[in-house]
Curated annotation (Swiss-Prot):
Cellular compartment(s): Cytoplasm
InterPro entries per the UniProt record, alphabetical: Elong-fact-P_C (IPR015365), NA-bd_OB-fold (IPR012340), Rib_uL2_dom2 (IPR014722), Transl_elong_fac_P/YeiP (IPR020599), Transl_elong_KOW-like (IPR013185), Transl_elong_P/YeiP_cen (IPR001059), Transl_elong_P/YeiP_CS (IPR013852), Transl_elongation_fac_P (IPR011768)
Family: Belongs to the elongation factor P family.
Species the sequence originates in: Nostoc punctiforme (strain ATCC 29133 / PCC 73102)
Any GO CC annotation of this UniProt entry: cytoplasm
This protein's encoding gene: efp
Protein name, entry field: Elongation factor P
């Protein structure tokens, strides 16, 4: 059990049989009445976001999540096969279990698989990945009317905005959280 006074971003709690992660919290102490904690929660399974208010000091069950490092070995149909790096056991995850970050998933990449009991909740990819550009328009000298960036398609199918000097075939580092170009590799 965890008290609402101990909520911090990243803390996982159980509400109505689902795991929710605290995104934001605000401890409010009005001049009249009792204090309360206003939170913004994200459902780890579905990705939906809701706002919920708790009384100050109210206790809720805390979710104990297990993280294990697994390597993406191959894709079979609509399933992604991962291998546990310690036990060498294989596990299969669907596109919905991985979420929208699937566009950065590449064979041989290591990721943190998050489990709650026997249930797989999702996958945390590394903060940044290095991928090759398979298609982008050539950047013309003096063509900065569009803000100095252009779309580029990566080897995994993801599309990110890159500076004009980046060309097809180059390897770039991409922030998987913000969907942004970081640097050239």
């Amino acid at each position: 059990m965890i008290s609402s006074n101990d909520f911090r971003p990243g803390v996982s709690i159980v509400l109505d049989g689902s795991v929710w992660r605290v995104l934001e919290f605000l401890h409010v102490k009005p001049g009249k009445g009792s204090a309360f904690v206003r939170t913004k929660l994200k459902n780890v399974q579905s990705g939906s976001v809701m706002e919920k208010t708790f009384r100050a000091g109210e206790t809720v069950p805390q979710a104990t999540l297990e993280k294990s490092t697994m390597q993406h070995t191959y894709k079979e149909g609509d399933e992604f096969v991962f291998m546990d790096m310690e036990t060498y056991e294989e596990g299969r995850l669907t596109r919905t279990q991985i979420g929208d970050r699937v566009k950065y998933l590449k064979e041989g990449m290591e990721a943190e698989v998050i489990k709650w009991g026997d249930q797989v909740l999702g996958v945390e990819l590394p903060k940044s990945v290095v991928l090759e550009i398979v298609q982008t328009d050539p950047g013309l000298k003096g063509d900065t009317a569009t803000g100095g960036s252009k779309p580029a398609t990566l080897e995994t199918g993801a599309i990110v905005m890159v500076p004009l000097f980046i060309s097809q075939g180059e390897r770039i580092k991409v922030d998987t959280q913000e969907d942004k170009y970081i640097s050239r590799e």
